[in-house]
C-alpha cells in the first residue's frame, strides 16, 4: 500500500460470512455484471475484536485513514461506489423491500459492532482484483499487531 500507493479490492467469495458474499452475488446477477469486488473497512477505533477476527495471531497491521481525504479520493474514482454498511435483522430483511443498490451495503444485524465501511467495484469483466490509487496523505497512522514478535 505504501510502496505501490494502491488499495486492493478482492472477490467476496473468499469471505468467511457467506451471507455477505451472497448479497453481493445477487447484486452482481441482478445488475448483469461479471464480478463485484470489495474492500471492507471499519469506522470504529482499533479493538481486540478486529485483531482477533481479521488477522492471524501475530500478523497484520491496522491502517487508519483520514476519512475526509479517503472519501474525497474515492468520489473521484470512476466506477467505484462506497459507503457505510446498514445492519438489519434477517426478519427485517425479509419484510422490507430492499433496493438492489443497497445489497452491497447490507449486513446482518449481529455484526453491527463492526461499523463497516465498504468500497465496491461492480465490473462488467470477470476480474479477481481491482487496484485503486491511494494518496499516501490519506493515511494517518499504521499500527503493528500487538502480538507481533518483538524485534531482536
List where the protein language model places each region.
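Partner-binding and oligomerization surfaces adjacent to conserved cores of proteins
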Residues: 1-152
Amino acid at each position: 500500500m505504501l510502496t505501490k500507493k494502491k488499495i486492493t479490492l478482492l472477490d467476496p467469495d473468499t469471505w468467511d460470512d457467506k451471507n455477505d458474499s451472497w448479497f453481493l452475488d445477487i447484486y452482481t446477477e441482478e445488475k448483469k455484471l461479471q464480478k463485484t469486488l470489495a474492500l471492507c473497512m471499519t469506522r470504529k477505533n482499533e479493538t481486540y475484536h478486529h485483531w482477533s477476527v481479521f488477522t492471524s495471531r501475530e500478523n497484520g497491521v491496522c491502517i487508519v485513514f483520514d476519512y475526509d481525504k479517503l472519501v474525497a479520493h474515492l468520489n473521484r474514482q470512476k466506477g467505484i461506489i462506497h459507503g457505510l454498511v446498514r445492519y438489519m435483522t434477517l426478519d427485517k430483511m425479509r419484510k422490507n423491500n430492499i433496493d438492489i443498490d443497497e445489497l452491497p451495503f447490507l449486513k446482518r444485524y449481529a455484526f453491527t459492532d463492526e461499523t463497516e465501511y465498504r468500497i465496491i467495484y461492480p465490473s462488467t469483466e470477470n476480474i479477481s482484483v481491482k487496484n485503486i490509487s491511494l494518496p499516501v496523505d490519506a493515511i494517518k497512522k499504521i499500527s503493528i499487531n500487538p502480538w507481533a514478535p518483538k524485534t531482536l
